[in-house]
From Swiss-Prot:
This is Anthranilate phosphoribosyltransferase. The keyword Ubl conjugation does not apply. The gene is trpD. Binds 2 magnesium ions per monomer. Anthranilate 2 binds at R166. It comes from Chlorobaculum parvum (strain DSM 263 / NCIMB 8327).
């Protein structure tokens, strides 16, 4: 479909088929559309609202473009969509280290900050972790530690084609929507926090299409009723659970799992150094109880999604043991040590 034809169709409010969307993304990534045309298409899709069928078409095209990496499909990705503007610390990153300390294999896909002060890549770097390892070294990192961070720009080089257009538009687009769904390792277990509850069903549809085995898609509320892309310790959390092709809907509260309810202000983060310090304090037990509870809740869900915990309650027990035994802290230190060694080896080989 030609650029002008596509724009006219979207202006009329019409939806695209999966094949049309796949062809559209192909034309965008191969620079067959003008920058103005691509910007118009992305803005019109955002205004209309992306359908599950359109998201699946875009997903299919983007996954053909990833830099390949081979990690076990049973590894778990923990991530959020961002965009809630609540300024919390990096809860899903802290949770990933707690779950890893409990033996859960982690393949976390992430990026630098887009809508917050500090993205997962930023806080990992502040902890001393090198996010720029090539795929082969990242595979070795996972073999040695059961943990890998997949830095989005390294695995989605085709995104450079739209980087300046997205920056100039200054709005969330289809690419922000798909970010949490396009883990290059094609993991089959995911814990995803979304700030906009209207996309939860869409995420479930794409994950079913992708063959995801077990996923928890969550949307939390603060005590003021504002949305969070986290499991909330400040209010209720709505969950869509996907397990082997079947969907279940739940609403849970922190008290259901023995956690206290805290004000969202208690979970405030800052820049990368501040958030790295919060994560260290959570893992060594010196953080506030609010910070610990938020990380425990996310880790408990991660343990459950991994299949190592039979329910969130069991995941909570695993997570508390990981923290209280200092396994999470010791494991994080080892992960960073191995990561730094592999980075040095890469530098030596390049030199």
């Amino acid at each position: 479909m030609r650029q002008q034809e596509l724009i006219q169709k979207l202006l009329a409010g019409a939806d695209l088929s999966a094949q049309e969307m796949e062809a559209c993304i192909d034309s965008i990534m191969e620079n067959r559309f003008t920058d103005a045309g691509t910007g118009a298409i992305l803005a019109l899709l955002q205004k209309k609202g992306v359908t599950p069928t359109e998201a699946i078409g875009a997903y299919e095209n983007l996954m053909t473009r990833v830099t390949p990496i081979t990690l076990p499909a049973h590894a778990v990705d923990t991530c959020g969509t961002g965009g809630d503007h609540r300024g919390t610390f990096n809860i899903s990153t802290a949770a990933a280290f707690i779950a890893a300390g409990a033996g859960v294999p982690i393949a976390k896909h992430g990026n630098r900050s887009i809508t917050s002060k500090c993205g997962s890549a930023d806080v990992l770097e502040a902890l001393g972790y090198r996010v720029d390892l090539p795929a082969s070294a990242t595979e070795e990192q996972f073999r040695e530690t059961g943990f890998a961070f997949l830095f989005a720009p390294l695995y989605h080089p085709s995104m450079k084609a739209v980087a300046s257009i997205r920056r100039e538009l200054g709005i969330r687009t289809l690419f922000n929507l798909l970010g949490p769904l396009i883990n290059p390792a094609k993991v089959k277990r995911q814990f995803i926090g979304v700030f906009d509850p209207s996309v939860m069903e869409l995420y479930a549809d794409v994950l079913i299409h992708a063959g995801c085995q077990h996923a928890m898609i969550v949307h939390g509320k603060t005590e003021h009723g504002d949305g969070l892309d986290e499991a909330s310790v400040s209010g209720p959390t709505t969950i869509i659970e996907l397990f082997e092709g079947r969907l279940c809907h739940h609403t849970v509260n922190p008290e259901d799992f023995g956690l206290n309810r805290w004000s969202i202000d208690e979970l405030a983060g800052g820049d990368a150094e501040t958030n790295a310090q919060i994560i260290r304090q959570i893992l060594d037990g010196s953080a506030t109880q609010a910070q610990i509870d938020a990380a425990l809740f996310a880790s408990a869900i991660t343990c459950y999604v991994s299949g190592m915990g039979s329910c969130i309650d069991e995941g909570m027990s695993m997570s508390k043991e990981s923290l209280e035994s200092l396994a999470a802290m010791e494991n994080m230190n080892r992960i960073i040590e191995v990561n730094n060694r592999l980075a040095e080896e890469c530098n030596t080989h390049e030199g």
